[in-house]
Amino acid sequence: MERITRADDRVHRPAGPWTPTVHRLLAHLHEQGFVAAPEPIALGDTLETVSFVPGVAGEYPWTEDIASEAALVTSARLLRQFHDAAASFPRSAEDDLWSQADRAPVETVVHGDFAPYNCVYDGIAAVGLIDFDTAHPGPRVWDVASAVYRFAPFTTGTVEGSTTADLAERLARAAEFCRAYALDDRSRGVLAETMIASLVAFVTTIEHEAAAGNPKFVSDLQHGHADLYRADVAYLEQHAAAITAAVA
């Protein structure tokens, strides 16, 4: 299995059947002035080459900078800028091939895994967005729900986050993310159920891909990620009404 490597200002990554479409998306983003994404450089049979996005990814455990309100707010604004730029991507039923099926209602091209670890930071400011392998057409709230789940965070475990915040703080961070993104009222009303749906879909993906022998997902399953997400689904279901009220 190919690995991600960096040489100077270029990053070499494993390519998939969807990579040509992702490269067209990345080129479109830059044409629209969204320069926070990598630029496509080359595409081979098994590897793609994109530009390196300078900064620090928000990996776990979070630093004080990544856990800050400023990092949350700038991440939300970055997501909004990405969605606005991607909305005009010229889609083609004949040429497009994404790693995931379209999700209705299609409003833009969503990132598919918007989280701190796929954002790049300069101190407390989100300045870049990477890893577009899961991009696909869909509703804006699909990405916002994933982001709120990660940034609040609404996880019950300690593997995926840093210091666990109390519910009131999580709700406040969720509301702040929605404000910074300028999420519409309809999407706010379905945010909690969309978070739950996205986690259920992710568990299904982990189990399906692990059964097919995908080494990444075999590892995820062995490390209890599916069980963690199931626990998070139960937590979200328990507090769905409070989440909906907080972000309204």
Residue ranges and their predicted role:
Residues W98-S99, T108, A115-P153:
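Catalytic activation segment of kinase domains across protein kinase-like and atypical kinase folds
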Residues F202-A248:
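ATP/Mg2+ or Mg2+-diphosphate-binding catalytic cores
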Residues V144-A182, S198-A212:
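Active-site activation/catalytic loop segments of kinase-like enzymes and analogous catalytic loops
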